[in-house]
C-alpha cells in the first residue's frame, strides 16, 4: 500500500487544485469523429495499463469513496473495469454511475471522469477475466458476483496532466 500513497496524494492534490479552474484547458477538443473517440479511448486505456493501478472515486450518499483498482479492458469499443457485485463500490456505482479515475505514470497523471454502466452479459466478463487471469481464483463469468462496467460513450473526459507540458484533454 505504501506505493499507492504518493499516487493517491498527487491525484487528490491535483483534483483539488485543478477542479477549481474556471477556464477550460487550451486544448479541450470536442469529439469530431468516431476515429478520434477511438484514439482517445485507446490512449486512455494504454495509460491505465502502463500505470498498472489506478484509483476509482465514487460517491456514497454525501461522502466520496476512493479505492485502488487494476482492471481495464477495451471490449466492443468500450472501456471496461471490473469489480465484485457484493462490494460497496458496486452498490455505489449502481446508485450513481458518475465516477472519476486517477492514475500516475512517471511524471504524468491521468484523470478520467464519466458514467459507468453495468453490463451483466457473459461475454465481457469472459474477456475481462481472460485479460486479467489472476482474478480467476476469485471470480467467474458464471458467478453472481463478477461485475463489469463500461464507460458510457459520450460521457468520458480523460485528461493527462504533467508539470512539464500542457494538459492533454480527450473525450470519448
Role assignments for model-derived ranges:
Residues 94-99, 130-134:
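Short, intrinsically disordered, mixed-charge
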Residues 18-19:
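C-terminal motif of bacterial Sec signal peptides marking the signal peptidase cleavage site
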Residues 39-41, 83, 89, 132-134:
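Charged, amphipathic alpha-helical segments
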Residues 22-36, 111-172:
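Charged, gly/pro-rich active-site loop segments
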Amino acid at each position: 500500500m505504501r506505493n499507492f500513497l504518493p499516487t493517491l496524494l498527487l491525484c487528490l492534490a491535483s483534483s483539488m487544485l485543478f477542479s477549481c479552474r474556471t477556464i477550460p484547458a487550451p486544448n479541450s477538443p470536442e469529439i469530431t469523429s468516431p476515429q478520434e473517440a477511438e484514439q482517445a479511448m485507446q490512449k486512455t486505456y494504454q495509460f491505465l495499463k502502463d500505470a498498472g493501478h489506478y484509483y476509482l472515486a465514487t460517491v456514497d450518499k454525501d461522502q466520496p469513496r476512493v479505492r485502488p483498482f487494476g482492471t481495464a479492458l477495451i471490449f466492443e469499443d468500450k472501456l471496461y473495469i471490473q469489480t465484485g457485485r457484493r462490494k460497496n463500490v458496486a452498490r455505489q456505482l449502481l446508485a450513481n454511475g458518475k465516477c472519476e479515475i486517477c492514475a500516475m505514470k512517471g511524471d504524468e497523471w491521468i484523470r478520467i471522469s464519466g458514467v459507468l454502466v453495468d453490463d451483466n452479459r457473459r461475454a465481457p466478463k469472459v474477456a475481462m477475466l481472460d485479460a486479467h487471469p489472476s482474478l480467476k481464483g476469485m471470480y467467474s463469468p458464471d458467478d453472481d458476483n463478477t461485475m463489469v462496467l463500461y464507460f458510457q460513450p459520450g460521457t468520458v473526459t480523460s485528461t493527462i496532466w504533467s508539470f512539464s507540458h500542457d494538459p492533454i484533454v480527450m473525450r470519448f
